[in-house]
Amino acid sequence: MLYSLVKKYLFSLDAEIAHEKVCQILRTLSSSPFLCRLIHSQWGYKNPKLENEILGLNFPNPLGLAAGFDKNASMLRALIAFGFGYLEAGTLTNIAQSGNEKPRLFRHIEEESLQNAMGFNNYGAILGVRAFNRFAPYKTPIGINLGKNKHIEQAHALEDYQAVLNQCLNIGDYYTFNLSSPNTPNLRDLQNKVFVNELFCMAKEMTHKPLFLKIAPDLEIDSMLEVVNSAIEAGANGIIATNTTIDKSLVFAPKEMGGLSGKCLTKKSREIFKELAKAFFNKSVLVSVGGISDAKEAYERIKMGASLLQIYSAFIYKGPNLCQNILKDLVKLLQKDGFLSVKEAIGADLR
């Protein structure tokens, strides 16, 4: 009831202004351990059936917040309090950048979806590291999503990813290389097997922490499988599928620029993930993201082969009790099918 009133006010504002107001509150909350405990007592949820150790990291539950919400790693403590099993901060770039021109964030309310053309706006890796360390250590795993600066030419992309990773080596529990945002010119062209191989070979020499590749939902299936295979062969520990889509047919009134996320992406993301899991389940850690807004969809993705999940748009539309609702209902679904833990259900449809 309370969030419905808050949501009504926030949705009366420009989408990016509303987001920044929420971020200001979350940054303030992060500075207060007492308030974070209070939030967690209201909206957190803990159940041993949902716990899992993956790549040496202990996840209290499989539901994470996707990159893009906390771009500068400045409100992680407050976000954890809402019940997420892990968070992904960023996207951070080596040098600060302002992103694309405003307006660049839009709501498609009927479809419970968002369209963003942000363009990796962030304060840069140095300040991101400083913000991260302010409240570290954290109670859940934290991933760091890394991107290329807009002004860097393709020929120097590998050096740029090397530079931003180097800046972030002392923060986070895993790293995700973002080659799939549609909002940096030509970035998606880097989703080819040669560059991906070079990228992960380079990264494996720099860190022993887990490395993930985040892919676009708009790749042809064969191309996607080729790129993913190249990443895994070069040392990638996991694949995150998927980023936002540029398929404008999924909403009634799309804007010219930007990627779509939310419910409009559910079917497309699920189909891509199904093909990914058929080829790479048990060969890599698979993370499903895109249009997950309830326990039923979360459970389907887990049975399809997802060890972990991420949400974003649904958190905007459904509010702070979303994690708790999904996780409680997920436990019921596991029990109904006779699974003793979420770990047992991963990939059940493939067995």
Curated annotation (Swiss-Prot):
Keyword Flavoprotein: yes
Superkingdom of this protein's organism: Bacteria
Keyword list, A-Z: Cell membrane, Flavoprotein, FMN, Membrane, Oxidoreductase, Pyrimidine biosynthesis
Leading EC class: oxidoreductase
CDD domains: DHOD_2_like
Gene: pyrD
Annotated membrane topology: Peripheral membrane protein
InterPro entries to which the protein is assigned, alphabetical: Aldolase_TIM, DHO_dehydrogenase, Dihydroorotate_DH_1_2, Dihydroorotate_DH_2, Dihydroorotate_DH_cat, Dihydroorotate_DH_CS
PANTHER family in alphabetical order: DIHYDROOROTATE DEHYDROGENASE (QUINONE), MITOCHONDRIAL, DIHYDROOROTATE DEHYDROGENASE (QUINONE), MITOCHONDRIAL-RELATED
Protein name (database record): Dihydroorotate dehydrogenase (quinone)
